[in-house]
Amino acid sequence: MAILGITLVALTGVTNEKAADATKDALSSLNNSLIWMIGIAIIISRGLLKTGLGMRIGYLLISLFGKRTLGVGYSLALADLVIGPVTPSNTARGGAIVHPIMKSIALSFDCDPEKGTEGKIGKYLSLVNFHSNVITCLIFITATAPNPLVVELVAKATNSQIQLSWGTWFLAMVVPGLLAMLLMPLVLYFLYPPEIKQTPNATALAKEHLAAMGPMKREEKIMLGIFLVLLLLWAGIPEMLFGVKVDATATTFLGLSLCLLTGVLTWEDALKEKSAWDTIVWFAALVMMANFLNKLGLISWLSDSMQSGIAHMGLGWEAGCALLMLAYLYAHYVFASGTAHVTAMFGAFYGAGLALGAPPMLFALVMASATGIMMSLTHYATGSAPVIYCSNYVTMTEWWKAGFIMSVLEILIFGTVGILWWKVLGYW
């Protein structure tokens, strides 16, 4: 579909009457640095799987904190959080790294949906597995693919006056995000209490897996070092200490180069990471179309129409923007892709909020938060959802109930603690 979209823009001349210029327009977003940052970061994240570092981190945390079911839940959440910054594919992170750990623990307690024993521990851990994945996506730009698209659309809507860097995003989201991560396992524990409360088997199982893995291999140590370098550079530490700024995309290319030079990854590994190349292509198509929808006036027209409708209701910008945010967030019930949802709705809704008089930075962060929160709603809301759901530990009704309750909790957290924190930071 992405290739079809690029082809149609080039052939129809909808953006430019000159054929050559129309083709340039169709391919214009392939030089977008944010797109390459997310694509290359997905390739780097393959190193967590290939070296086994991601699994080791997960089992290590469970061996330390897994004596109780609640502790196992927090360990899974912390594992997702720790590897989140360098895993833009939340499907890979939640579905291919954390979920197998969760399943092995559940099965060690004879918790098997085929036997009707999913309530022992698996239902609770599955929901923690998923919702920790979603909250991690809120905290880091590089934790899921739609986030860079949000950054791009905010910059376009404000004529580049607001450019959310990796560090700015992290600083804004870390306090409300960590609070949400802290409360989430507790809320789910009371919502769907596991039958098994004590889990000494979990720590023993984790230690067995760690023993089987042996001491950290050379590749794991190198991957861990690259991971730390990326975090330091993305967070802007060199600029703070030495006044040397390193571009976020350049940092990502540095990470991939180090992976290739040290042998942690080969170029064959990079080529086999199809999701990265898919992301670059369809992301480029979506960003290109979003840009030209804005340039051709459609987004402005939709924004003005919504602003006019809200103004006729007699609402101030605060209530109007709250209404826009809620409509945008819960519209995700009819979307199976976060990126498609952002492309279709974010620009118009953000523009309408600005037209109502909302502070641009404040509303950007509110809408960015909503973009993450909406992924918690359904079993098809984001890529990791069907992977975890299809393990059959949770019914659809239970999944949707938990998703709605968590969305309300996260809206309250980001709408109170988040907004106050952003005020302290001087973001509005």
Stretches with model-predicted labels:
Residues 38, 70-84, 110-136, 163-172, ...:
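Alpha-helical transmembrane segments of multi-pass membrane proteins
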Residues 11-113, 273, 277-356:
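Membrane-embedded alpha-helical segments and adjacent helix-loop junctions characteristic
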Residues 43, 78-81, 97-104, 129-137, ...:
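Transmembrane helix-bundle signature of multi-pass membrane transporters/permeases
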Residues 91-107, 126, 139-158, 201, ...:
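Re-entrant/interfacial helical elements at transmembrane boundaries that shape
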Residues 347-356, 370-428:
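In a subset of proteins, long, contiguous C-terminal domains/tails are tracked
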Residues 1-37, 157, 161, 167-304, ...:
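Hydrophobic transmembrane alpha-helices of multi-pass small-molecule transporters
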Residues 3, 70-75, 126-127, 170-174, ...:
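Hydrophobic alpha-helical transmembrane segments
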Residues 109-194, 385-418:
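Membrane-core helix-loop-helix motifs of multi-pass transport proteins
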